[in-house]
A protein has these predicted regions:
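A short acidic, Gly/Pro-enriched loop at the edge of an enzyme's catalytic core
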Residues: 252-260, 268-269, 273, 329-365
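Intrinsically disordered, low-complexity glycine/charged-rich regulatory or linker segments
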Residues: 1-170, 174, 180, 212-216, ...
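C-terminal substrate-binding/active-site "lid" region of AdoMet-derived donor-dependent transferases
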Residues: 2-6, 225-229, 377-448
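Conserved class I S-adenosyl-L-methionine
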Residues: 189-202, 206-209, 215-225
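Acidic, Ser/Thr-rich peripheral helices and adjacent loops at domain boundaries
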Residues: 230-279, 337, 409-410
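Glycine-rich helix-loop-beta junction characteristic of Rossmann-like nucleotide cofactor-binding loops
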Residues: 184-189, 358
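A short SAM/SAH-binding and catalytic strip from SAM-dependent methyltransferases
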Residues: 362-375, 394
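Short glycine-dipeptide loop
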Residues: 190-191, 214-215, 384-390
Length: 484
């Protein structure tokens, strides 16, 4: 069976991997001789390169990683355990090993599993504990003394869990089950043309890219000077995934909808060449002038044989100055060309993205930002084709209620639904399965719906009716009296 399936993906240098220890995750790049600090342990990932993802390693002396050998626990051996813990007194004297003794064991190179066994043997109350209490004690000591980590491949589930546990504020407290609901309600699939507006460090964008698998196109709307893709880089997507990833600033959406969108005149490549030629001509002129000066100095040198050594030193210094000046001007010229090339490429991509948006045939819209969702959604829905889903995430319910009301007044959408996901973890163990005492207070709210063709006449009449409803009752009575 293994020969048919083959080994899984292997850890390569330059990959982005996720370190896992119990329920703690950390995303790190896989580089040689780079010190990694994780859960109060430091180590190097050199020995992990070449192993398959999902391998569990043990940190040895010198920060090296070694694959952990699986030890089969004997089930035939019966454990000696007490009936209850009523006779156990927590006086701090039950453990015979001191802190210095444990440190000495570590200095001798004894591994964590052996240290745990020593702690069990030197505990005076371990045999009196119940079987459940003994398992809990062993688990606690293993977590403290066993330096074991697992390297896993990044995915939407792992990265969303990591961000929600470590830095929930960076992803607007977007819980992993809520993100899964967004991908489902948005009908994310390969070949789609999606619009994504998010301020979750690129986590939602990476989840959409992973679901689409590199097929289709994604237009990322961003505020400010540029998009933030810190979490997207942790996925480790190949370069072809980014070929169909476009970006467009939110500040230009209104001008694009009104038809006044325009960019500055693009610098063409011939203009760059002309500029380079002018700079190169200037450099040749300066070279000729400097060479003439050197020739004049050489003639005076022959005339004045007494100061021959001093003139030679002066000529060498001038030649070095000219060479340094030429190199510096060449670097400046290269920097100018590179800057112009990047500006030209950026404007070219901006025009291509604007052309994609003006087609107004996007297959879906995902919004998960820290800004108020109503103006964002009303503007971006103009680029979505009819009969396509849209999903809006917000940490709070009130902004989505206002957005729900505005959409009902505007029209052009059906199947509007405001929902909240409820998540609770369970401990599943023999004879002690129960809900965990701690659970998440909330994972945010989702507003979803489907676009339809907007009836302009109906929307205008509903707008007038809304204005009438906003008029004071006294004013409406006066108008009716005048008509009478």
């Amino acid at each position: 069976m293994e020969a048919v399936l083959g080994p899984g993906p292997r850890i390569c240098e330059g990959d982005c991997a996720v370190l896992k220890r119990d329920d703690v995750f950390k995303a790190v790049p896989v580089l040689r001789r780079r010190k990694i600090i994780f859960e109060k342990q430091w180590f190097y990932l050199d020995n992990a390169i070449g192993h398959t993802y999902g391998t569990t390693f043990e940190v040895t002396s010198g920060g090296n990683l070694q694959p952990k050998q699986e030890v089969e626990e004997s089930t035939t051996e019966t454990k000696e355990a007490g009936t209850d813990n009523r006779n156990i007194v927590d006086d701090g004297k039950s453990q015979k090993l001191t802190h210095d003794d444990i440190k000495a064991l570590k200095d001798k190179g004894i591994k964590g599993q052996e240290i745990v066994q020593q702690l069990i043997e030197n505990s005076t109350t371990f045999r009196d504990k119940t079987e459940f209490a003994q398992d809990k004690y062993i688990k606690k000591k293993k977590k403290k003394y066993e330096a074991v980590i697992t390297i896993v491949k990044p995915s939407t589930r792992i990265l969303s869990t990591m961000y929600y546990a470590r830095e929930p504020g960076k992803i607007n407290h977007l819980r992993y089950d809520t993100l899964a609901q967004m991908l489902t309600l948005g009908n994310i699939r390969a070949g789609n043309k999606m619009i994504v507006m998010e301020t979750c460090a690129g986590l939602v964008l990476g989840a959409v890219m992973e679901r689409m698998g590199g097929y289709g196109s994604i237009i990322q709307m961003y505020p400010g000077g540029g998009p933030v893709r810190a979490a997207t880089s942790c996925f480790g997507f190949p370069k072809p995934f980014f070929d169909n990833l476009h970006e467009f600033p939110l500040s230009k959406v209104d001008s694009l909808l009104s038809g006044t969108f325009s960019t500055e005149t693009l610098p063409s490549e011939p203009e760059d060449n002309v500029l380079v030629e002018e700079e190169s001509n200037g450099l040749t002129d300066e070279k000729q002038i400097s060479l003439q000066e050197i020739e004049e100095e050489s003639t005076t040198e022959t005339a004045m044989e007494i100061n021959q050594t001093e003139e030679q030193d002066t000529m060498d210094i001038n030649a070095e100055d000219v060479e340094f000046k030429e190199n510096k001007e060449k670097e400046n010229k290269d920097n100018v060309r590179e800057k112009q090339r990047k500006q030209w490429e950026r404007r070219k991509k901006l025009i291509e993205t604007a052309a994609l948006l003006t087609q107004k045939n996007a297959d879906g819209l995902i919004v998960a930002s820290k800004f108020h969702p109503t103006p964002l959604l009303l503007s971006l829905l103009e680029f979505v084709a009819p009969s396509r889903p849209f999903v809006v995430y917000c940490q709070y319910k009130e902004p989505l209620l206002e957005c729900y009301t505005k959409l009902r007044e505007r029209g052009g959408v059906i199947n509007l639904k405001l929902s909240e996901t409820w998540l609770r973890n369970y401990q599943v163990l023999p004879d002690r399965s129960h809900p965990k005492l701690t659970m998440s207070g909330g994972g945010g709210y989702l507003l979803s719906g489907i676009t339809v063709v907007l009836d302009k006449g109906k929307s205008d009449s509903s707008h007038l009716q809304a204005l009438k409803m906003e008029e004071p009752s006294s004013k409406r009575c006066k108008v009716q009296d005048l008509h009478c």
